[in-house]
């Protein structure tokens, strides 16, 4: 996993984030070891984090390459699992719910900068009847803009970004919230954020089928 550097490093040892070429080099080294270990021990053992692939501009490994997703709590394989789960749930919908034409209601998916392009492509490949998804990347001014993961977005940064954006409801990953489930890392509560952006703000579980269920549930009036 690439080192995470905040904007609060004054007086600390100098470090730098990975460049595109450096991230590619890490993946190439990891792939050699993964192939060797799979042949010798039956497991790939080495699993570069999603951030390495995003930084390198390379496709994520296929679902089976993550084996049992043993490091998903640290975000390793999280995007591949999300896509696999979302696609499986979407494919089970009736064709009438998977159309891209007709009138649409606009919903926002707010996320960290690193995941934005991936999510935009996910929604583009999985149309939902009557729903247009806008993916809004949120820059992290609280910890520093080099911090690009969704789980470290604060309520202040989120509301500043969304205040003037069009969309009748906002969906976020529950990973943005503290363990209590109702408060961001900067102590802003969900209710405070909802009042600022003046629309529903809906936390969603990290699974892809959780996301699809939340979108359909809100669109069909099954959740507030």
Regions found by a protein language model. Give the residues of each.
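Auxiliary Fe-S-binding modules of radical SAM enzymes
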Residues: 1-224
């Amino acid at each position: 996993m690439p080192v995470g550097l905040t904007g609060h490093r004054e007086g600390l040892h100098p470090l730098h984030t990975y460049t595109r070429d450096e991230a590619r080099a890490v993946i190439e080294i990891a792939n050699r070891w993964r192939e060797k270990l799979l042949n010798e021990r039956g497991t790939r053992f080495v699993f570069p984090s999603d951030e390495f692939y995003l930084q390198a501009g390379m496709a994520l490994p296929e679902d089976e390459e993550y084996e049992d997703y043993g490091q998903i709590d640290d975000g390793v394989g999280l995007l591949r699992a999300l896509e696999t789960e979302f696609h499986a749930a979407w494919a089970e919908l009736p064709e009438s719910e998977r159309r891209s034409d007709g009138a649409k209601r606009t919903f926002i998916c707010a996320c960290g900068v690193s995941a934005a392009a991936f999510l935009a492509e996910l929604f583009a490949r999985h149309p939902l009847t009557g729903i247009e998804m806008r993916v809004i990347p949120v820059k992290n001014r609280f910890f520093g803009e080099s911090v690009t993961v969704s789980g470290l977005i604060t309520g202040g940064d989120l509301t500043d970004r969304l205040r003037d954006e069009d969309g009748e409801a906002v969906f976020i990953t529950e990973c943005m919230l503290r363990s209590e489930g109702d408060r961001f890392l900067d102590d802003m509560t969900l209710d405070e954020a909802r009042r600022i952006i003046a629309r529903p703000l809906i936390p969603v579980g990290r699974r892809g089928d959780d996301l699809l269920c939340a979108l359909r549930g809100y669109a069909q009036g099954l959740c507030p």
